[in-house]
């Protein structure tokens, strides 16, 4: 009986020691998997290995994820032993700015972020037409704005120079009633003066012969001095039937005076016609 009890106790001890051995085997497998993962990561490339080695917390998380995936795939039918991980508050790697959850705050750049400038440069080199079109559009807008500003500045300078020179710009608009009336009166005065001078020219040309005859008959009266006095000469014109009075200061009108009178009357008539 004592032997049987001793054998039972030994078997119980063996059974109690068997699960720790299984757990030790599982931890050994996990370590082997992590070593294999590290070797694969080192074989990927020098750039990736340098980035991962610079971030030990990321390496630890990758190891943990790979070990969990391997255990889930190989030992899905076996109950996995629970593994205790440190909390986020106690894990200094998770609190550090270089952790995977805070890559945006870290000073180091990942491979994707490093590749972004190179991709932008390749895009610019690959499509120069789009870049040239954008630059041409910007240049055209800039040239248009510069031309508008230059025209505005030239207009302002012209207005300021006109004000300094005393010139007032003509205001185009409807004429007032007073202005129209004044223009009409001036036109009437010019027409009346032109009509008088024209009549004087016609009468002087027709009565020139009569005046010469009267002057020859009145030669007896020429003994008197006429330098300081004026002499009135009347001549009857048969065509018109009225007398024309010529007021002569020093003498009769000559041909040169008639020519100047005709030219002046012609100019006045032309001005009245234009008005």
Swiss-Prot record:
* Coiled-coil intervals, chain numbering: 175-200
Q: Alphabetically list the UniProt keywords.
A: Coiled coil, Nucleus, Phosphoprotein
List the residue ranges of the region (Required for interaction with CSNK2B).
Answer: 202-226
Residues the record lists as Phosphoserine modifications:
66-67, 143, 145, 147
Chain intervals with Basic and acidic residues compositional bias: 1-12, 23-32
The record's subcellular location field reads:
Nucleus
Its main localization is nucleus
Q: Tell me where on the tree of life, at the top rank, the source sits.
A: Eukaryota
Give residue spans, biased composition: Low complexity: 203-219
Bias category Basic residues: which stretches? 169-187
Q: Which InterPro entries match?
A: RNF111_N (IPR029306), ZNRF3_Arkadia_E3_ligases (IPR051073)
Region called Disordered, residue ranges: 1-50, 63-233
Q: Name one GO cellular component term.
A: nucleus
Ranges of biased composition (kind: Polar residues): 87-121
Q: How does it assemble?
A: Interacts with CSNK2B (via KSSR). Interacts with JUN; the interaction is mediated by CSNK2B.
Q: What is the name of this protein?
A: Protein ARK2N
The gene designation is ARK2N
């Amino acid at each position: 009986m004592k032997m049987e009890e001793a054998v039972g106790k030994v078997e119980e001890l063996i059974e109690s020691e068997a699960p720790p051995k299984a757990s030790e085997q599982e931890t050994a497998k996990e370590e082997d998997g992590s070593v294999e993962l590290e070797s694969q990561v080192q074989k990927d490339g020098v750039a990736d290995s340098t980035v991962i080695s610079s971030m030990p917390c990321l390496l630890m998380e990758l190891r943990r994820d790979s070990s969990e995936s391997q255990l889930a795939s190989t030992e899905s039918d076996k109950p996995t032993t629970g593994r205790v991980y440190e909390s986020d508050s106690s894990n200094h790697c998770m609190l550090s700015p270089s952790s995977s959850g805070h890559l945006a705050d870290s000073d180091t750049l990942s491979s994707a972020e490093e590749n972004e400038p190179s991709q932008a440069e390749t895009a610019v080199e690959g499509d120069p037409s789009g870049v040239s079109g954008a630059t041409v559009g910007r240049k055209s807008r800039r040239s248009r704005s510069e031309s508008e500003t230059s025209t505005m500045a030239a207009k302002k300078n012209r207005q300021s120079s006109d004000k300094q020179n005393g010139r007032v710009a003509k205001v185009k608009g409807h004429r007032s009633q007073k202005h129209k009336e004044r223009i009409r009166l001036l036109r009437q005065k010019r027409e009346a003066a032109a009509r008088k001078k024209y009549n004087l020219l016609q009468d002087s040309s027709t009565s020139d012969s009569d005046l010469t005859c009267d002057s020859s008959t009145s030669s007896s009266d020429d003994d008197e001095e006429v330098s300081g006095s004026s002499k009135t000469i009347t001549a009857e014109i048969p065509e018109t039937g009225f007398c024309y009075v010529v007021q002569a200061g020093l003498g009769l009108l000559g041909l040169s005076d008639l020519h100047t009178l005709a030219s002046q009357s012609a100019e006045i008539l032309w001005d009245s016609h234009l008005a």
